[in-house]
């Protein structure tokens, strides 16, 4: 996991970004300038590659890329109105704000790499997928172990010439096979 990114590093990046790239809408520039001017807001800002799963996010685009110029969302509400976004950012300054920036060569920019963070919600999703894979592996392992133990018990019943136990264990084996189909 990446070390914490300082407020000054984030502010320096925003200033560099605004000097280097022209936003598709001037309101996007205003919002970024406002954020950079308030340490208490910058503290809660996270630059991410995608906003999937984030509760509150801002997607901004510079000229030269094919993306929406300005999108703000909070929960299930999405808007392209910069004033609504500005007011939410101003009034809820102590809530996490995830920002996705679209600009030419974003993924190869060392300045952006310095402040970019992993989306924690995407990581949770991956963890869930890994959990499902682990659960499936455990289920399969337990079934294989149980089946092997049952086959051994069937062999033991045959060796002991115990028909009642043999038939009982074979029924269990057939039930097991039906569940796996």
UniProtKB/Swiss-Prot annotation:
Pfam families in the record: IDEAL, UPF0302
Lineage: superkingdom: Bacteria
Family to which the UniProt record says this protein belongs: Belongs to the UPF0302 family.
Protein species of origin: Listeria welshimeri serovar 6b (strain ATCC 35897 / DSM 20650 / CCUG 15529 / CIP 8149 / NCTC 11857 / SLCC 5334 / V8)
InterPro entries linked: IDEAL_dom, UPF0302, UPF0302_N, UPF0302_N_sf, Virus_scaffolding_prot_C
Record protein name field: UPF0302 protein lwe1947
């Amino acid at each position: 996991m990446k070390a914490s990114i300082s407020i000054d590093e984030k502010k320096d990046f925003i200033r560099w970004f605004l000097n280097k790239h022209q936003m598709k809408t001037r309101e996007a520039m205003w919002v970024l300038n406002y954020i950079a001017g308030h340490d208490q807001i910058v503290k809660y800002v996270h630059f991410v590659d995608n906003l999937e799963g984030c509760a509150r996010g801002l997607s901004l685009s510079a000229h030269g890329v094919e993306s929406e110029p300005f999108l703000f969302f909070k929960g299930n509400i999405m808007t392209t109105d910069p004033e609504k976004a500005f007011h939410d950012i101003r009034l809820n300054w102590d809530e996490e704000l995830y920002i996705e920036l679209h600009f030419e060569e974003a993924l190869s920019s060392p300045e952006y790499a310095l402040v970019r963070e992993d989306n924690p919600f995407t990581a949770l999703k991956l963890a869930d997928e890994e959990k499902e894979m682990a659960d499936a592996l455990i289920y399969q392992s337990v079934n294989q172990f149980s089946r092997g133990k049952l086959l051994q018990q069937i062999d033991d019943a045959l060796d002991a010439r115990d028909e009642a136990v043999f038939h009982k264990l074979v029924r269990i084996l057939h039930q097991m096979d039906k569940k796996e189909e």
